[in-house]
């Protein structure tokens, strides 16, 4: 099991770094979605390794060939549904799952604080669970998430998108501000 735990942690670190590299490369238009995909993957692998370390199975009891979903793993590790880390991960997971690439570019500035919190949480949690200093793999100055432009106002969103999508975006933006 030690070998599986180590492989999960190693892959987790790689996914984490890849997410940061994608996000911080300004020429990539798919960077918000790419970051959310890789950062969630990094968390999933790191938390599964933490479960193994605690002596818990990472497989569904009724399907021993299938590992637990990231949602289940997050709930097992962060049992309090109001934990800031859990809320942060669930919001990024929601973004990853809905994959609204044509919308998220306009909200990059709103996602940046959420993503930055996720990065810092990962740094702290990989240290707590696995005693790993992430700066041994990536320089500390690369742990910063940067956003490059001002968000659209609610008025601009309403002019740019259909009423249904505009209201969804405004609601999503308000939720992000609460979590940041």
Positions of PLM-derived features:
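A conserved mid-domain beta-alpha-beta active-site/ligand-binding segment of alpha/beta enzyme cores
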Residues: 155-180
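Short, hydrophobic, well-ordered secondary-structure elements
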Residues: 32-52
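Charged/polar positions within long, soluble alpha-helices
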Residues: 21-24, 47-52, 97, 101-105, ...
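Generic structural signal for well-ordered, non-transmembrane alpha-helical segments
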Residues: 40, 44, 90, 97, ...
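A broadly used, surface-exposed interaction patch
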Residues: 47-112
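Amphipathic, Lys/Arg-enriched alpha-helical patches that create a basic surface
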Residues: 111-161
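Charged alpha-helical initiation segments
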Residues: 1-35, 146-150
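Non-transmembrane, amphipathic alpha-helical segments
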Residues: 4-7, 27, 31-35, 81-84, ...
């Amino acid at each position: 099991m030690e070998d599986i735990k180590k492989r999960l942690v190693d892959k987790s670190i790689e996914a984490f770094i890849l997410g940061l590299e994608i996000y911080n490369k300004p020429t990539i238009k798919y960077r918000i979605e790419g970051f959310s995909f890789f950062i969630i993957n990094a968390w999933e692998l790191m938390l599964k390794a933490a479960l193994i370390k605690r002596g818990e199975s990472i497989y569904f009891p009724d399907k021993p060939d299938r590992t637990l979903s990231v949602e289940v793993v997050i709930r097992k590790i962060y049992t309090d549904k109001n934990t800031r880390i859990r809320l942060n991960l669930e919001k990024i997971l929601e973004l990853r799952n809905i994959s609204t690439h044509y919308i998220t570019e306009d909200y990059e500035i709103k996602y940046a604080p959420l993503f930055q919190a996720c990065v810092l949480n990962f740094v702290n949690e990989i240290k707590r669970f696995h005693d790993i200093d992430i700066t041994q793999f990536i320089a500390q100055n690369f742990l910063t998430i940067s956003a490059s432009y001002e968000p659209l106002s609610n008025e601009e969103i309403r002019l740019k998108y259909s009423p249904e999508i505009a209201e969804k975006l405004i609601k999503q933006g308000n939720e992000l501000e609460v979590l940041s």
